[in-house]
Amino acid sequence: MFCFQCQETAKNTGCTVKGMCGKPEETANLQDLLIFVLRGIAIYGEKLKELGQPDRSNDDFVLQGLFATITNANWDDARFEAMISEGLARRDKLRNAFLAVYKAKNGKDFSEPLPEAATWTGDSTAFAEKAKSVGILATENEDVRSLRELLIIGLKGVAAYAEHAAVLGFRKTEIDEFMLEALASTTKDLSVDEMVALVMKAGGMAVTTMALLDEANTTTYGNPEITQVNIGVGKNPGILISGHDLKDMAELLKQTEGTGVDVYTHGEMLPANYYPAFKKYPHFVGNYGGSWWQQNPEFESFNGPILLTTNCLVPLKKENTYLDRLYTTGVVGYEGAKHIADRPAGGAKDFSALIAQAKKCPPPVEIETGSIVGGFAHHQVLALADKVVEAVKSGAIKRFVVMAGCDGRQKSRSYYTEVAENLPKDTVILTAGCAKYRYNKLNLGDIGGIPRVLDAGQCNDSYSLAVIALKLKEVFGLDDINDLPVSYDIAWYEQKAVAVLLALLFLGVKGIRLGPTLPAFLSPNVAKVLVENFNIKPIGTVQDDIAAMMAGK
């Protein structure tokens, strides 16, 4: 195996024996083969589009296939084998459609050479062996490999956001078309400039997709609003829901109503507490625990069923006993966990098994008490715009520091807690994603009633932070987003954070600090391009970085 898509990859070069995430070699290789098959689908999809006969029948499959390969999403080899088999069947159906259209248009059979991703075939007994030859290292040139993987890794993040929007009935053809264009491009001999242009286009598509998901979430569930979220527990048994899928959240709340079973969020589902549509449920108690990497002891002490709607799912440790109450749904898979099937057309997922099991479980063990505040997405912050602008003009707020992104296991991430603790009292932290758990329970106070930590929501709600920045640029009459009193100190872990990073670069943001390490998939030459064009920089010491940010550097 060779995998370097996450921040915790071995020695910051790549995992070759077993993933630092816990992913076995066999699973990693099957993920590579699935991407290979998706490239084959994309090749024929692109060719049909060129002939004026675009085929949209594989759009959902492509999104879900990319999403399933995100770090800590799917650990189930059988699920990957099934997706690969389905992908090959879909590709071959698409090939036949293309060959027929080509012959009808040109009066002759198609005879040009095609990449292997468009032609290889084999049954499940051949998957393991084939997977070894189609991975990342199949591309020999280091810089070409780096640019292709930067594109694919960013594409995985965009696909995750597009899939969430699609579940709510929101999609844009341009996003689905770009999925095919980007995947197919990685089978072509393109110039460096062409590949860089595609990476930047992925950043633009990340903005489009996050905007679409924002529209989907807020149209369906209302605009997030300032909310005090309980982090204690009640006396009833509960169900813990983690991940990002708000439709799963909505259906679970509805089905648990009146059952005597409470619902708690975990990890990236915390922002569900901010949406008006969910506040009407009195049995929605609050949030339990911290970010994804702390889940083993937290899932253990929760006592009730746990539902993983998306990443991040961490492998169970030997001492863990909660596998019999672990449920997955959507693209998530884990051998031994129960999987909740997709909703039928026009229907809802069936969570009755979780509810029945919850009724037999003791209530959650209390691990903390109190509350945290959030709900500062763009609609809410812009409603406070006059107050914020006045605070900036008066000097009460000297600087905003965007500390969005992911949390992770590495001890070096204490940097983000220390930055939050040591920033001057006239600064405000803007955050989204699970990076917030490094400082959202600190008592950092407020500035004239404006909390010093403004949590916009999930990682995709980094879009809100971009909207806020663009609005401030307009209010202050600035020509360049980089002239704002805003610094970016971003923590990354998985592929959605890469999509967010590309979105910020597309919007012209420069001087981003990215940590705790720069991505292993950036070759020295590609990293140099990002440094020279966008002034991306690694994190340094807490005091040096704070001093630089306060000086606008």
UniProtKB/Swiss-Prot annotation:
Family: Belongs to the HCP family.
Residues annotated as binding hybrid [4Fe-2O-2S] cluster: 244, 268, 312, 406, 434, 459, 494, 496
Keyword Metal-binding: yes
The keyword Cytoplasm is assigned to this record: yes
Xref: InterPro entries: HCP/CODH, Hydroxylam_reduct, Prismane-like_a/b-sand, Prismane-like_sf, Prismane_a-bundle
Matches recorded under Pfam families: Prismane
Assembly information from the UniProt record: Monomer.
Catalytic reactions on record: A + NH4(+) + H2O = hydroxylamine + AH2 + H(+)
Compartments, as annotated in UniProt: Cytoplasm
Entry EC no(s): 1.7.99.1
CDD domains, per database record: HCP
Residues binding [4Fe-4S] cluster, per UniProt: 3, 6, 15, 21
Swiss-Prot/TrEMBL keywords: 4Fe-4S, Cytoplasm, Iron, Iron-sulfur, Metal-binding, Oxidoreductase
Co-factor note (free text): Binds 1 spin-admixed [4Fe-4S] cluster. Binds 1 hybrid [4Fe-2O-2S] cluster.
Identification of the protein by name: Hydroxylamine reductase
Required cofactor names: [4Fe-4S] cluster; hybrid [4Fe-2O-2S] cluster
One GO process term, biological-process aspect: response to hydrogen peroxide
Role played: Catalyzes the reduction of hydroxylamine to form NH(3) and H(2)O.
Signal peptide extent: none
EC category: oxidoreductase
GO-annotated cellular components: cytoplasm
Superkingdom per UniProt: Bacteria
Residues the record lists as Cysteine persulfide modifications: 406
GO molecular function ontology, one term from the record: hydroxylamine reductase activity
